[in-house]
Amino acid sequence: MITRRDLLKTFCALPFIACLPRPVNAQNIVDFPQLKTGYAQRLKKILAAGELPYIDIESSCNSMKADIDSIAKSMDRLNIGLMALSADIGKGQFEKGVRFDNLSEKLLVSYPDRFIPVGNGGQPPVLTEAPDAFLDAQEVAARKKQMMLLGEFEFRHYPSPRQVKRGDTGRDVRVPIDGPTGHRVFSLSERTGMAFQIHYEIEDELLTPLEKMLEQYPKAKVIWCHLAQIRYIERASRYTPAYVDALIKRFPNLYFDTAFGDAASTYPPSNQRHARVWAAFGGLKSEWRDLIVAYPKRFLSALDLGQDRLERITEYDQKHRDFLKRLPTDIRHQVAYRSAWSLLFSEDFS
């Protein structure tokens, strides 16, 4: 039974509840300054506890299946600072006409200090079967300030090791980066000032088209996912630390995320260890380490979690921290959270 005292407690609490900050208003417009304050407080709290937070700039999920409460608890347990958790529009949603999934809005209502509002993943079927409608919807959301960065666009994507094992060939994607869709994405980044991510397999024949797009859209902020992840080494003779060094010097708005497998990770179709940053016995190759040390502001932490591996967040966290600990302390902090902070807010973290 509700007593008079219970009612009094409830009514007394109402003014306090009404004053709680709301990161998303009635028009679904995200309050970026308010989010920024909450993000900074969370990062500083983890740092004050003597732990290293990082900003996961690249993870995704199925918004209909993901257990957000579980993810948030794991972030607290593992001292993960922030996560850009993108919603992938699957076949079911696509067939219902969904072209923008507002997962970020829901995340910010429940956990405004943990999640970065991000656009949807550009992958099949939306990017391959309805690219214009998909990009129209992403642009509307971007202009309404419903996100801080665009999602990950799969221009060239081999099936992942997990997809290969289960015979899923639907993610063998080829969308010309210099085609109409690529031009729209690069242009959208320039016009909105928002960064976007590309999944772009490393092959010699794919490098020149990317370079031309970077030249044509110098203000586009591009995060090339999976540094030095080469599935077939025989197809990638040009891609070396020296080549990446040259790209960094030529293109000031090009970034790289550090989501890659561990030293033992093998790509089944080629039977090759595809995370090329690692030496044979598990240490970072000196030439890749030196490159990161030389340009730490251009490298970002990332886990690359997906719906089929969200339950492995602890494993992915451990592997990413194993990479981070091999960097000098100041560089470690830069890559872990400072680089992403600068990219999102155009200022140094302080």
Model features per residue range: what roles?
Residues 34, 42-47, 97-197:
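Active-site gating/metal-coordination segments in enzymes
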Residues 54-62, 66, 70-95, 114-123, ...:
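Divalent metal-dependent hydrolysis catalytic cores, especially in the metallo-beta-lactamase
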Residues 50-53, 79-82, 111-117, 146-149, ...:
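Short, well-ordered coil/turn segments that N-cap beta-strands
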Residues 38-42, 66-71, 97-106, 133-138, ...:
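Alpha-helical scaffolding within the catalytic cores
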